[in-house]
Amino acid sequence: MEFINKLIDKIVSYNLTEPIVYKHESELQLKYDALMKLKSEIKENKELEQELLMVKKGLIGENEIEYQLMKSDIGMYILRDIKVKYKDLTAQIDYIVITPIYTYFIECKNLMGNITIDSKGNFIREWINSNKQKQWIGMPSPLNQVENQRNVMKKIKLEQASSLDKLMIQKYFEDYNKVLVVVANQYTILNMTKAPKSIQSKVVRADRLNERIKYDLKNAPKDENKNSKSKMEERAKRIVEKLCINENKDYYLEYKERFTQTKNTLKSELERFREQRAKEKGITTNYVFTDAELEELLKYKPTTIETLIKLKILPQIKIKCHGQEIINEIIKYTKNT
């Protein structure tokens, strides 16, 4: 009986039948937590709110991918937010997924609107603007991005490999280390009817991610060796402990310095301008702009007269007399920061 139990334990330890999150920590989560804390301390900071919105969108995308992977019955190790460096090259990989045969480098995209990939492999984003009109814009290829990330990892492996292993890496690395671009927004329509077939197999929606991985594993060569659970864990451990860069940044302090310094410095610049303008015109400072109006200027930072008029921060007479000069001060400060 003891022999049978040991045999069962050995089989279970050899084969992995469910996903394991080996590294869950995410830079985006740390940034989000820091921004939320700062938001409760700094009121009405438009730049902070824009940064928070961008970080939140990325975090939602990352979480969606982890959620989908954890629903799978595929035995795999999931590594989230892996940053590696080779000489002057740095790669920040959203996910590395290690399966018994293939390792996947995953780039997450959580975009508003739809994505079309044309016959040349160009990524084109389409969305409806505030005027309910369709807009199209080309975007940097996320596929090139994740391929570059994989290439950094390849360079690291080549540097550490023996002469014989280097030949194997050069020949087979791309075959066993696949790249995927995963579209995380469930409302995004992905149009790849004209895309090259080589690209169609590398871009998927999040809800089809597990299906893609299963297809690859099912269609792998029949005589392909499968890595055991211990081998997969060994590789995951090596990536996280030996290769992954941990910068230990304090994002709260970083963001606090960025957003409070920006506001305070611009405030002092506009106050200096107001004082000087009032002297030049022989008027009191309130006739340039009041303290309440100053806070609105700091909040929205308009850079055109049209925007200043639209926001209704200042009355028409102040815009006519001082508007362009105020805009110039904001633009000058923005360029210098």
Language model region names:
Residues 325-337:
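Long, highly charged low-complexity segments enriched in Glu/Asp and Lys/Arg with interspersed Ser/Thr
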